């Protein structure tokens, strides 16, 4: 059901019909068609007739409902006409902190931070710094409609912006990439020609009630107002994704991980270490390159996994960091043999059941909250996460295949606010009730029916998990260049339950099997972690080992094998065997 918003300007009063769940940008586009300006960058809005207006483009990215606007509300527009005849008609931005570098603009109950100092000074991931400098324009060849030479350009061959919807549709790209989404928002909210103010384009949703509201009433649950309570929530499929693709550096990484199920029939959980790189199959895309899967302490079962305390997690992270890799996600198996004795497995996850269960959705959301994405384009310095969740299960033809996912920013916000929990149906999430510490607003989800019409449904008491899910693609490289050696397999950690033990005997056997004389066997993540736990090598010697693995300089290998610590290791191995 649409609402009508009224806009009063010096040219008259105009009525604009709007969908309550539509982006406010659509409302502004209708308004611009009625007044004598063409650029939203020059439009200012206020909810009071005699107050100075605020930049309208700062409200883009919010829905009409989130801005607290209702049917019949009046907003006051000020701007400089296209003729430029009246300079006094332009309203300057003012904030609650005049003569300072930052403040906020507000309409309804939404407050949007502004600053004159530009983006925040934070340390982003290298891939973000690279893609930030890339315009990401989609080049197009000359067409039969072009009437110019090879060096000319027209509307039929000019480059498209990386967020172009038609390009995504034609190339079957389901989600916009994170940096394409960021550039689109930045284009809407910040003018390239106006450096006097800056609005952070990214803002995480917040569905938690403000327990320390200062509007003069008692704290919740004894008092509540429109300033401290979250707005109604409408869940929709997220149109962008933080990571577009997951690439396993080599197929042996996956095969070694699945071997536990092949030998025992129990499920397995692992943490994926790697890095993020640009992904050229999607405009301004990002891929997670998985170099190793570490298996933390766990108790596997036929239909689940019980995680145990991971005492050396910080040590594993430190070794990975020295090698230039870090946690990029988690992976787990959900495999059941088909019983046909031909290597096939049951297909349990499909469109008629679920792709991630409700508990897995909650786990993914908590992991993403724990591994936040650092960005300079958010007022808080972070926005969502690049942490991925991969499940290895059966495909439609009984094959074993990985599938990679993330959950939406709405899922993260719902978990932060403790609004959702699991239910007895794996494909549905339960909406909690309000209590003394938790206020649950109206929650709905919106989808298109078979006629292409938008239908909104009440999410209480349960709603489908698919509205919080973001799917990624995954693959193995055609010409793999892994960081770690794939020909030598050291015993993987925490597999004692089926007689695979990490001990000095395993180290001796592993090193003796390397006859290359080039130290290739040292380039194994599981071996490095175990060797660190033995404390045989000194700190400088272990750093030398990591430098050799990272840079593959033969001189470093020679210095390592001639070091006192390495000599001690060889002596201990000879005596232990």
From Swiss-Prot:
Record GO terms (molecular function): K48-linked polyubiquitin modification-dependent protein binding; ubiquitin binding; ubiquitin protein ligase binding
Annotated coiled-coil segments of the chain: none
InterPro entries (alphabetical): MPN (IPR037518), Npl4 (IPR016563), NPL4_C (IPR007717), NPL4_Zn-bd_put (IPR007716), Ubiquitin-like_domsf (IPR029071)
Organism superkingdom: Eukaryota
Membrane-crossing residue ranges in chain numbering: none
Keywords: Cytoplasm, Endoplasmic reticulum, Membrane, mRNA transport, Nucleus, Protein transport, Translocation, Transport
Membrane topology of this protein: Peripheral membrane protein
A GO cellular-component term linked to this record: VCP-NPL4-UFD1 AAA ATPase complex
Family membership: Belongs to the NPL4 family.
Summary of the function given for this chain in its UniProt record: Involved in the import of nuclear-targeted proteins into the nucleus and the export of poly(A) RNA out of the nucleus. Has a role in the endoplasmic reticulum-associated degradation (ERAD) pathway.
Protein known as: Nuclear protein localization protein 4
Species of origin: Scheffersomyces stipitis (strain ATCC 58785 / CBS 6054 / NBRC 10063 / NRRL Y-11545) (Yeast)
Gene (name only): NPL4
């Amino acid at each position: 059901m649409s609402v009508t918003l009224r806009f009063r300007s010096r040219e008259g009063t105009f009525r604009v019909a709007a969908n309550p769940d539509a982006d406010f940008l659509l409302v502004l586009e209708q308004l611009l068609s009625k007044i004598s300006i063409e650029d939203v960058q020059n439009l200012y809005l206020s909810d009071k007739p005699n107050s100075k207006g605020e930049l309208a483009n700062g409200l883009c990215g919010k829905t009409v409902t989130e801005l607290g606007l209702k049917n019949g509300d009046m907003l006051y527009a000020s701007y400089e006409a296209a003729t430029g005849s009246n300079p006094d008609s332009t309203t300057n931005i003012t904030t609650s902190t005049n003569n300072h570098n930052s403040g906020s603009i507000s309409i309804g109950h939404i407050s949007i931070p502004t600053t004159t100092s530009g983006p925040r000074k934070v340390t982003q991931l290298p891939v973000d710094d690279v893609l930030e400098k890339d315009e990401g324009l989609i080049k197009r060849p000359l067409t039969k409609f072009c009437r110019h030479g090879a060096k000319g350009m027209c509307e039929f061959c000019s480059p498209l912006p990386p967020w172009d919807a038609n390009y995504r549709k034609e190339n079957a790209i389901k989600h916009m990439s994170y940096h394409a989404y960021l550039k689109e928002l930045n284009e809407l909210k910040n003018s390239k020609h106006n450096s006097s103010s800056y609005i952070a384009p990214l803002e995480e949703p917040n569905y938690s009630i403000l327990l320390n509201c200062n509007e003069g009433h008692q704290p919740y649950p004894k008092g509540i107002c429109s300033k401290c309570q979250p707005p109604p929530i409408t869940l929709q499929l997220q149109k962008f994704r933080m990571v577009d693709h997951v690439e396993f550096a080599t197929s042996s990484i996956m095969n070694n991980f699945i071997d536990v199920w092949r030998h025992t029939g129990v499920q397995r959980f692992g943490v994926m270490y790697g890095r993020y790189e640009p992904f050229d199959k999607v405009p301004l895309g990002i891929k997670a390159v998985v170099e190793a899967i570490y298996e933390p302490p766990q108790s596997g079962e036929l239909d689940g996994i019980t995680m145990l305390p991971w005492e050396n997690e910080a040590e594993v992270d430190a070794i990975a960091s020295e090698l230039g890799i870090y946690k990029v996600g988690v992976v787990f198996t959900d495999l059941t043999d088909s019983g046909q004795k031909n290597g096939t497995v049951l297909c349990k996850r499909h469109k008629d059941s679920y792709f991630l269960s409700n508990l897995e959705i909650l786990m993914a959301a908590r992991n993403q909250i724990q591994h936040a994405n650092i960005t300079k384009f958010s007022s808080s310095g972070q926005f969502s996460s690049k942490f991925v969740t991969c499940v290895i299960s059966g495909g439609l033809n009984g094959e074993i295949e990985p599938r990679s996912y993330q959950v939406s920013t709405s899922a993260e916000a719902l978990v932060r606010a403790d609004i959702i929990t699991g239910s007895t149906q794996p494909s549905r999430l339960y909406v909690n009730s309000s209590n003394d510490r938790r206020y649950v607003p109206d929650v709905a989800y919106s989808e298109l029916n078979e006629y292409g019409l938008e239908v909104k449904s009440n999410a209480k008491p349960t709603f489908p998990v698919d509205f919080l899910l973001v799917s990624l693609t995954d693959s193995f490289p055609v010409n793999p260049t892994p960081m770690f050696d794939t020909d030598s397999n050291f015993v993987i950690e925490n597999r004692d339950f089926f007689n695979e033990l990490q001990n000095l005997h395993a180290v001796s056997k592993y090193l003796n099997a390397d006859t290359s004389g080039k130290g290739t066997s040292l380039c194994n993540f599981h071996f490095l972690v175990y060797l660190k736990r033995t404390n045989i090598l000194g700190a400088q010697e272990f750093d030398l080992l990591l430098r050799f693995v990272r840079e593959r300089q033969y001189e470093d290998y020679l210095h390592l094998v001639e070091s006192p610590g390495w000599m001690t290791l060889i002596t201990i191995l000879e005596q232990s065997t």
